[in-house]
Amino acid sequence: MTNHQKRLAVPKSWPVERKEEAYTTKAAAGPHGEEGVPLLIVLRDVLGYVDSKKEARYALEQDSILINGTAVSDERRPVGMFDILAFDEREEYYRIFPDEGGRLSLTPIDEDAAGSKLGKIVGKTQVAGGDTQLSLHDGETLLVEDATAYDTNDSIVVSNDGEEIVAHFTYEEGALVTAVSGAHAGRIGTIDEIQVTPGSSANNVLIDAENDDERFETVEEYVVVIDENFTDGGDDE
């Protein structure tokens, strides 16, 4: 199996220039599905910390580059929306976040905020023993005892060890949200109205945009609940 893919075929969210070279690195299997960006692309093309795959591998051997609190050894490890990228030796911390063009970008955050990660709940399943399993947007799962406390489309902030939910943001009218895909990717605002669509069609969401008087509309799938500290580099709690 090849470790490369054509640049023209990569998802629009990848932060690569499509016309520079014919091929780019292919992500390994892991979280975020097809949207996952190989760590090498972030280190080389976005941050400029390495010039080659060889340099990336050497940097990773030092165990000082972490994703969501865990040291990474594979330069093809996929990273994606809301992942936390930490460089311990540099004391630099970033949250991966879609910009207004829909590409994944790096938002600097402080060390405290780097200790946990936001996830959108995309599914709930009851499992043996009576607990409820929450499925998050990146493929991760989490067991909770109180099934009624969390709903699909809510957001939770989970500690990097996965053992504690440190914040919970409810999906409802009046909630602060960001659009993560589509024509309005990267925009932030407050939900004005959730338009429930009968049948299997997607619900629409009307959002009052932050910092201007505009309102925009997107589908529920593209909306993630955040809080006021989420985009300024502070802690989510």
Swiss-Prot record:
InterPro entries: Rib_uL2_dom2, Ribosomal_eS4, Ribosomal_eS4_central_region, Ribosomal_eS4_central_sf, Ribosomal_eS4_KOW, Ribosomal_eS4_N, Ribosomal_eS4_N_CS, S4_RNA-bd_sf. GO terms for biological process: translation. GO terms for molecular function: rRNA binding; structural constituent of ribosome. Disulfide bonds: none annotated. This is Small ribosomal subunit protein eS4. Belongs to the eukaryotic ribosomal protein eS4 family. Residues 37-99 form the S4 RNA-binding domain. The keyword rRNA-binding applies. PANTHER family: 30S/40S RIBOSOMAL PROTEIN S4, SMALL RIBOSOMAL SUBUNIT PROTEIN ES4. Keywords: Ribonucleoprotein, Ribosomal protein, RNA-binding, rRNA-binding. One of its GO terms (cellular component) is cytosolic small ribosomal subunit. The keyword RNA-binding applies.
